[in-house]
């Protein structure tokens, strides 16, 4: 079965797309990355940077996660991300999303050895 690091990559990494933020992108990607299986995941962020650059955030500034854990890290530079949010009319199995194309710092949780991203916490 999938590791936490693999799940992070499936749910959040889209390195090679520059994603012009159209809702089609979110609708396709949420489906393709299996976040509409059994329910519609309400919010999800895709990161359009190299995996190497995102993994490097694990050695950048330590911050407290939303849940109070202390293994979150904030990127020193802004990153190109797409926020996908469920629309009001979205209803499983016809999950519908709108896209926001953003340039923000990401906050991710890291764990393990090697110390790698396992959870997307926020963007600021």
UniProtKB/Swiss-Prot annotation:
Basic and acidic residues composition bias: residue spans: 1-13
Reactions accelerated catalytically: an [RNA] containing cytidine + H2O = an [RNA]-3'-cytidine-3'-phosphate + a 5'-hydroxy-ribonucleotide-3'-[RNA]; an [RNA] containing uridine + H2O = an [RNA]-3'-uridine-3'-phosphate + a 5'-hydroxy-ribonucleotide-3'-[RNA]
Keywords: Disulfide bond, Endonuclease, Hydrolase, Lyase, Nuclease, Secreted
Binding site for substrate: 7, 10, 41-45, 66, 85
Broad class of enzyme this protein falls into: lyase
Disulfide bonds listed in the record: 26-84, 40-95, 58-110, 65-72
Enzyme Commission designation: 4.6.1.18
Active site: residue positions: 12, 119
A Pfam family the protein falls into: RnaseA
Location in the cell: Secreted
Molecular-function annotations in GO: lyase activity; nucleic acid binding; ribonuclease A activity
Family matches, as SUPFAM superfamilies: RNase A-like
Major subcellular location class: secreted
Cellular component GO terms held in the UniProt record: extracellular region
GO BP of this protein: defense response to Gram-positive bacterium
Main function: Endonuclease that catalyzes the cleavage of RNA on the 3' side of pyrimidine nucleotides. Acts on single-stranded and double-stranded RNA.
Family stated for the protein in its record: Belongs to the pancreatic ribonuclease family.
Assembly with partners or alone: Monomer. Interacts with and forms tight 1:1 complexes with RNH1. Dimerization of two such complexes may occur. Interaction with RNH1 inhibits this protein.
Protein name: Ribonuclease pancreatic
Organism per entry: Camelus bactrianus
Underlying gene: RNASE1
